[in-house]
């Protein structure tokens, strides 16, 4: 089941006011001419990714709030991003069922998340934010079907009640102090407690775990070719891929390693094996080819080989992100290599 079920951008970038939601499946391929809005859709996904950590920073780095708003006829004053997310994918706990662990047994299968923002001078201001049951749209009492609602600056959250040291499945309606909340940051960045606010926390964690790869830099002096610090994250490939060595080292010690080598042998006829080396607090990776006495370091591998390995490592990860977004992954690859990756996608 895909984590994101749909995405709607309204009054944002090239998406005019009144834009319809875009349904999403397990695999989504965007094809269109230059300027058709493919990159803008990816920008919207990156906004979701930034919500739990730094929405204001993401808006600022994109040129400021006014640059994000629709600039066509009848210029938009408010931009809205809305998505529906699959409930069960939020709460996966090893060894126990998600509903048993969190005490959540009466949820519908889909949540709806919506955030609206406008420009306040040079700053961004959040004007609306809602987390609710997807099936409860239009309820006579919208508060009863929501887990958080901005309510025109009078925010309300439904928190799980606590009986002693035990969490229950009952909800308590809490009115938050608006002066204690930052007006340019999402509630996902300000309320984080998996037991008291499981829906907010679960959605925020999944948004943060999403990965987007847009700037492919495989030049001779690229960071991913150099010895990489061993203390970088090893759970998922970073957007700039500077932890590729650590990801490959993790993959080497997983059940997916044999499949990784199988794909590399189909990609490189001379491929013999792949290895990583940890020394001096850094990680390096090497390619061994038949007929060669010494392995080939990352600094000498071709751009296409590095690109194929990076994509392969991400697609074979034992703990994949809830969403992987790749912009033009086919660049620099032989058509035969694209066919190999297509089967994994």
Regions found by a protein language model. Name each.
Residues 4, 80-84, 110-112, 125-127, ...:
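Broad gene-expression machinery/nucleic-acid interaction feature
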Residues 43-123:
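Conserved P-loop NTP-binding catalytic core
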Residues 98-262:
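Electropositive, glycine-dotted interaction segments
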Residues 10, 86-92, 118, 132-134, ...:
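A generic structural motif
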Residues 94, 222-224, 283-287:
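Short, solvent-exposed polar/charged micro-motifs at secondary-structure junctions
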Residues 1-54, 270-345:
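Switch/communication elements of ASCE P-loop NTPase nucleotide-binding domains
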Residues 232-298:
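Extended helical coiled-coil dimerization/tether regions that scaffold
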